Amino acid sequence: MMSKLGVLLTICLLLFPHTAVPLDGDQHADQPAERLQDDISSEHHPMLNSIRRREQNQFMSFTSVKLRDSRGERCCGPTACMAGCRPCCG
């Protein structure tokens, strides 16, 4: 069974080699670095910008809770410890 599978695999690789797959007209296999330096980078991509904005807004609303502790100092709710705020103790 395994030898038949090996023969079949060999025949398929000989008939349809991987290098025979045509590339797109504007895509060159020997220039991958140029494809990585497209005009649309992850810093300026509109979809990623909206995600970043949403994350920043959630962080700002999470950390901008203005609570006062017993001494009158600003502090955040107890779940804000993850964001680096000092939680109010009562």
UniProtKB/Swiss-Prot annotation:
Highest taxon in the source lineage: Eukaryota
Record InterPro entries: Conotoxin
Positions of region (Disordered): 24-43
Cystine pairings recorded for this chain: 75-89, 76-85, 81-88
One GO CC term, this protein: extracellular region
Signal peptide: 1-22
Alphabetical keyword list: Amidation, Cleavage on pair of basic residues, Disulfide bond, Hydroxylation, Neurotoxin, Secreted, Signal, Toxin
Domain comment quoted from the record: The cysteine framework is III (CC-C-C-CC). Classified in the M-2 branch, since 2 residues stand between the fourth and the fifth cysteine residues.
Record-stated family: Belongs to the conotoxin M superfamily.
The protein, known as: Conotoxin TxMMSK-06
The species this protein was found in: Conus textile
